[in-house]
A protein has these predicted regions:
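Bacterial Sec-dependent N-terminal signal peptides
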Residues: 1-24
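Catalytic cores of secreted/periplasmic lytic hydrolases that degrade extracellular macromolecules
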Residues: 19-168
Length: 168
């Protein structure tokens, strides 16, 4: 019947769409995992946290900020003296940091967490305590979304990003 064909087509479409989204996540991870691990060794920020935040904040590297400003973490200007871009976020025309490369964004994200007083307590956690880091980022005010920590945890667990936190 027409109804069965429509339902079958819809299910096929949803499966393909889901697989395509999963492929985008995996593509992002494959592209930036080395940078995240390098930052973990340099700064102490777990690679799982960097990757999960990068995935979430940049829409898998496809957000306007990621594409136009190489800003994969949604970091705003606040005292920034480098290049800037203006983008609507919580308010209209907010100032965001702009980077020469995605790797510069990753480095600045690590330094942002490492040297801002409100995040210092995170570095007392074990690097493998990704849940502690996620809840800590939320409690320190990294994002306004009440589900932020859980979203990060879901990404980390679904894509096994915690495996990047273990010394090789």
């Amino acid at each position: 019947t027409l109804m069965r064909k429509t339902v079958a087509l819809l299910i096929s479409f949803l499966c393909c769409f889901s697989l395509a989204a999963q492929d985008l996540y995996e593509q992002y991870i494959a592209t930036y995992s080395d940078a995240a691990v390098a930052e973990m060794y340099r700064s102490g920020v777990p690679a799982s946290i960097t990757l999960a935040q990068g995935l979430l904040e940049s829409g898998m590297g496809r957000s306007t900020l990621a594409v136009q400003a190489n800003n994969h973490f949604g970091i705003k200007c606040h005292g920034w003296t480098g290049m800037k871009v203006y983008h609507d976020d919580d308010a209209k025309d907010e100032c965001f940091r702009k980077y020469e490369s995605v790797e510069d964004s990753y480095k600045d994200h690590s330094d942002f967490l490492r040297y801002k007083d409100r995040y210092k307590f995170l570095f007392d956690l074990e690097p493998t305590d990704y849940k502690g880091w996620c809840y800590g980022l939320k409690s320190a005010g990294y994002a306004t979304d009440p589900s932020y920590a859980n979203k990060l945890i879901n990404i980390i667990e679904k894509y096994r990003l915690y495996e990047f936190d273990r010394p090789q």
